Amino acid sequence: MIETRTTTSTSEIKHDNSLKTGFEITKEVEEFRNYENSEDRVSEAYRNSHTYQTYDYATEKKKQYSQLDTSIKMGLWEAAELLNTIIDESDPDSNIPQINHCLQTAEAIRKVYPDSKYDWFHLTGFIHDLGKVLLSKKFKEQPQWATVGDTFPLGCKFDESNIFYEFFKMNPDYNDSKYNSECGIYKKNIGLENVTMSWGHDEYFYLVCVGNKCLLPKESLYMIRFHSFYPWHRHNKYTHLTNEEDEKMLNWVKEFNKFDLYSKDSEPVDVESLKPYYQSLISKYFPNELHW
C-alpha cells in the first residue's frame, strides 16, 4: 500500500444519501446518468471499452505508463488547459469542454467545504479528471474507450451492475476460465490496491500523482483512482475484493461522487477568475516539477 498522509478522519465526513447537496443542481437527480436516452456516441464508447479492456491490455498499459515519461514536463494548470478541446464521449450528462467540469466540481466542493483544512478536497475536484489529457494530441490522442467511462476490475467475473453489461460478452476475458469466477485470479478481500482495474484516466492520473510524490492525502488519492468505479461506490458490488482500508475510504469516494456527478452544468465557468486560487493549491500539493 502506498503511504500517504491523512489529514482528516473519515468520521468528519458529512455524507448525505438524501442528496441535500448544499449546491444548486441544474436538473432532476433522475436525469443524471441516463444511458437509455443517451446519444449513440455514449453506447459506442462503452461497446468498445467492454470489448477491448482485457486483463492483459490493462496490465500492459499500467506497466507502460507507470514509467513516467521524463521528456513530458507539464504543470497541472497546463494539463487542465489541454482539456479545453476534449469532450468525454462516454458521458451522457455533459458535452462541454472538460476544464469546465473540473472547475464546476471543485467550486461545488468549495461551497460545501469552505474551510481551508479541506483545500486538498477543493484541489481534488479540480484535478480529478486530468488523466483525460491522454485524449489530447500531446499524448497521441489515445482512444476514448481506453481513457474514459466507468471503470471495473479485470481478472475476475464482470458484475452485472456495470453499465452496458451486455457488451462484456464480446470481451475475450468473458469466457476465460481463469477470469470468470467471482474472485478470478484474486484472493478474497485482497484489497483494491492489488486489483487490476480497467485502464483509463483514473488509473493514469493516480500514477502521475504517486510517481511525482504529490502531498495529497490518502482520501484524495482514492477519489482520483476510484471515482469512476460506479459498481463499487454506487451499487456496493465487488466487496469480495475490498479490504478494511477500502471500506474506510468508501464514504469519501461517495462524498466526492456527489460533486463530480451533480455539479455538471452546461453553463461555462469563468476560468481566469478561478485560476489564482487553484494555482496556489497546485503549488502547495505538487511542489515538484511534474513528469507525465
UniProtKB/Swiss-Prot annotation:
GO MF annotations, alphabetized: inositol oxygenase activity; iron ion binding; oxidoreductase activity, acting on single donors with incorporation of molecular oxygen
Enzyme Commission number, as recorded: 1.13.99.1
Required co-factors: Fe cation
Binding, Fe cation 1: H101, H128, D129, D260
Keywords: Cytoplasm, Iron, Metal-binding, Oxidoreductase
Pathway recorded for this protein: Polyol metabolism; myo-inositol degradation into D-glucuronate; D-glucuronate from myo-inositol: step 1/1
Record-given protein name: Inositol oxygenase
Organism: Dictyostelium discoideum
The gene coding this protein: miox
